[in-house]
Every structure is written in C-alpha cells, then in structure tokens.
C-alpha cells in the first residue's frame, strides 16, 4: 500500500522572491527550471535564507546558469560549506535552452529569476522569466495602471 504524502509537500513553498523584477521588466514568458545544488545549499534554502534580487540567468556553452544568486552559508555547515554567490547550473531541456538563447540574442531580452521554491516533490525550482527591460516612461505608465485598478476595485467594493 502506498504511503501517504507528508503534509509539508502538499503545495509549493516559496523560499525567495524577486518582486522588483516584475516592476523593472515586462515579463513575456515564464519557465520552470531545476537547480543543481550542493547539500548545504539545500539546507540553507529550506531554512528560508536566499536572495535573488540582483541575480540573472545566462546561457553559456549550451548550458543555462543562475548568476549572482545569494544563498548564504548553512549555519550548521562545516568546512565543506558552499560559496554563497557561486554560479549555479539550471536544469532545462535542450529545446528550452535553444529557445531562450534565441530570444536573448535576437530580441534583446533578459532572463530574470522571479522566485525560488520547493515543488510538491520537495525539489528546488527556479521560476525564470523571459523579459524585456522597462524604460522610465513605461514604469510610470505601469504605476498609473496599477493605481487605477486598485482605485477601481476600491470604488466597486464600497458601492456594493
């Protein structure tokens, strides 16, 4: 008889989120990629310690890499602890890597990590966005639209 799933893995658990990326970039497409991590990195992520605010992804030699993501050293780690800002390999299919590479080279887009989370099976994943940078004018328009939607929702809520 199959063993029931533990309750901790019923849904995904977000570890780090890059909220600024949604403001600075216009997100065109999203991808889910696995990350090749060392043991102490997984333990540090499970402890909820990570920052992807200044990180980005790039394709080098047919492989995708997460650059400048900060996963601090594990507090109970020994001399074999990991480097906090080392490049981490992203696990994607070759078709996905070729598609990302084509978009980045031809259309001038950027690969931005939106979040790091554990999926229902307990595997660490990165949500990558294929995005285009916003100019200052675009950001102002985005803020106006967001404020109008918020005001509209407030008006509808107060009337009903």
From Swiss-Prot:
- Note the PROSITE patterns from the entry: SSRP
In which compartments does the protein localize?
A: Cytoplasm
Could you say which residues form the signal peptide?
none
Chief subcellular location equals cytoplasm
Which terms are listed as keywords in the entry?
A: Cytoplasm, RNA-binding
UniProt-listed Pfam families:
SmpB (PF01668)
The free-text function statement in the UniProt record for this protein reads: Required for rescue of stalled ribosomes mediated by trans-translation. Binds to transfer-messenger RNA (tmRNA), required for stable association of tmRNA with ribosomes. tmRNA and SmpB together mimic tRNA shape, replacing the anticodon stem-loop with SmpB. tmRNA is encoded by the ssrA gene; the 2 termini fold to resemble tRNA(Ala) and it encodes a 'tag peptide', a short internal open reading frame. During trans-translation Ala-aminoacylated tmRNA acts like a tRNA, entering the A-site of stalled ribosomes, displacing the stalled mRNA.
Q: Which NCBIfam families match?
A: PRK05422.1, smpB
Protein's UniProt name: SsrA-binding protein
